[in-house]
Curated annotation (Swiss-Prot):
Coiled coil: none annotated. It comes from the Bacteria. The active site is at residue 15. Signal peptide: none annotated. This is Phosphocarrier protein HPr. It is found in: Cytoplasm. The lineage of its organism: Bacteria, Pseudomonadati, Pseudomonadota, Betaproteobacteria, Burkholderiales. General (non sugar-specific) component of the phosphoenolpyruvate-dependent sugar phosphotransferase system (sugar PTS). This major carbohydrate active-transport system catalyzes the phosphorylation of incoming sugar substrates concomitantly with their translocation across the cell membrane. The phosphoryl group from phosphoenolpyruvate (PEP) is transferred to the phosphoryl carrier protein HPr by enzyme I. Phospho-HPr then transfers it to the PTS EIIA domain. Residues 1-88 form the HPr domain. The keyword Iron does not apply.
Length: 89
């Protein structure tokens, strides 16, 4: 199991489009992918769960991956967040 804190840096935070990109990417991996903020943990493969975190710009979230491709999943998700979900601000 891997766990890593990261900060949401895109201007609109985890809005619908960003959440969709994150859940779609998470769904490509066999590993379980969880995301948490302020004590609430959700399945990162669930768009409703991710949106319920209400993570705006500057929010710190914790990613957790567990399974055979956990490192690849973690690296890909961190890259997506660092790239501002491809929104090119």
């Amino acid at each position: 199991m891997l766990q890593r804190d990261t900060t949401i840096i895109n201007k609109l935070g985890l809005h619908a489009r960003a959440s969709a990109k994150l859940t779609q990417l998470a769904g490509n991996f066999v590993s379980q992918v969880k995301m948490s903020r302020n004590g609430r943990q959700v399945d990162a493969k669930s768009i409703m769960g991710v949106m319920m975190l209400a993570a705006g710009i500057g929010s710190t979230v914790t990613l957790e991956t567990d399974g055979p491709d956990e490192q690849e999943a973690m690296d890909a998700l961190l890259a997506l967040i660092a790239n501002r979900f491809g929104e090119g601000e």
